[in-house]
Amino acid sequence: MNFHELKTASGVLLTDQYQLTMAQLYYRMGIHEITAQFDHFYRSNPDYGFHQSGYSINAGLDTALDWLDQAVFGKEEINFLKNHKTAMGKRLFSDDFLKWLRDDFSAKAINLYAVPEGRVIHPNVPIHVIEGPLAVGQIIETGLLNTVNYQILIA
């Protein structure tokens, strides 16, 4: 992967196809802008082999906020999605949905409530709560989790 591809893949496209296809479904159904809440949590403390941690430390919030600031669908991201095909060779994302991503998608439309960095956190208790448009929350979910999960693991 060259630098250009890495830059594209680490931006708003740091997600999976499921999140994008669900967002497109919400868009088609006309519910993409209803307010929704997403709770981010982890299920168990790290198991280091020789001992299992009794808690974790929240980390990665600054990185997550930086990532959110850069989460935009520009020309490169739209062209990448425009070239996505189904197994039958049909385009996966419609032009009107791609136009919405380019013109109207904004990670700034969400409210993020988070446990402060450095605080003790526990399994099954929300670390972040995202409130905002359903499709936006769906699209940014994987990127946010990928951004903070490793940092929490090593903190």
Predicted regions and their residues:
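Ordered alpha/beta subdomains of enzyme catalytic regions
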Residues: 1-155
